[in-house]
Amino acid sequence: MNAYDLTRRVYDVDLWWQPVRHRFRRWSSYDPAGNTLLDYDKFVRVAGNVGVLAETPESGAIVRIWTASDVNRQVRMFQGGAGKPFLDAPLPALFDGSFNNRTMFQTGVDFSVTDEKQWPFVPPFTGTHRGAYVCRVPIPFRDGLRVEADLIANPRVGLFYHIDCLLADEPQDVHGFDGRFAYRDFTVRHAESIHANPLAFYADELLGARCVPFQGRGDRVTLLNVKGAGLVRRLTYRLTDVSLENLHDLRLTISYGNRPPSFHAAVSLLHCAAFELHGYRSRALGYVDGAFHFQFPIPFRDDVTIALESITGRTFGVEGEALLLDREPPAGALLLHSHSAFDAGAEPSRYVFADFPAASGRYVGLAFSCKPYQQEDNEVITADGEVVARGTGREDYFNMAWGFKEYGAPDHGCPVQSGEWPWQDLQRGHGYYSAYRHHFNESIPFRRSFEACFEKDHDPAKVGHGWASTAFLYLTQPQTANAIPADWRRWAKPE
């Protein structure tokens, strides 16, 4: 676990199927009393005029910092129990390009050889996203971490934050953060190219991948059926004779061997089209010029069958291609799974969007739709019986802040949003949205069990809100997918 490897893989889909060698932990400003409107200025502890945002004796790496606060307060990071911080900077400098590696780093590295004072806190690893400030610069630490911030006695400038960390199973493999330049040029150019075209991959053909065309017509069409072992890199397909309403009934399925599908998802929900179908491009999914793109890697060890089927028996046409590597995946490669869910909103309690009581693997993302508009619910993610992440509002989970607005990035976005301010109007029965989030460096591993939910904020006025989603996971062994019920299509209308 080192800064170079983590930085070059900020958007690496091949991280998802690799064996788990770390744990995940988030520190956030959520309100322990459950009031989602007070999810700010909550700290691990307070000492004088300093609040501790995150603290652990373990070794690992910070892989994501999110905040909705741009106030100029000082942030300091310590590792290994040191009394002197290795980073001492104003909070906005981690996001807005004002970082100065000559004065804000205390790592022993000589930065005078370059004019680029902002490295490594540079775009596209840092930036603002629809009101939020997000930093993806990986910051490894050895033998402990403490992150603290100065307190500001002003209720109008509360600190909302997430600090996502990987905790290493093998601490000796962690190389502490020093901010050196050895990997700057490659990693920045690579990340910039992904932001320019998230759907583009360049090296698969060099690795021997071959294109497998497919086409068919009927109420079920097999896109790919391969014996033995291999790795499907991506699928691209176009549909004919399928309206948006009928897209709700069309399912993409993936089966390993002769087992029931481990992946079973409505095509419309996958592509954030529960209400409207808009063009978008993420690293794993996209819809561009009438073509659907599915770029979750699909390793398989004992045959794979990928199909499209209409659960209502409607005939459709499809043509496209799969990119296939005819080689056995490395030992321990994880298998792609889905968990689809739907809740019409009858009970204001919890919306569970992933539930695997007996499994091992990684949680890597979510496609989510909501109607009417709602945002002030917090995600609660539990791995192996322990809560490892709590959120501060649903839009915060999707790397936004202060509401949902249409936006797209390689790892998160909101292709569809309808409704206008004020919040009260949206919260109480108007508007809808569809959003996606992919976890790369910050994928959440588990070894025995996993559950993820949004805790509804128990406002009786919100009974009747509905949710639909597909979660994406990679597991060590095939399990049967949880499929969304057929009646969700009656809810999926932009009314």
Predicted regions and their residues:
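Beta-strand-centric surfaces of beta-sandwich/beta-rich domains
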Residues: M1-E495
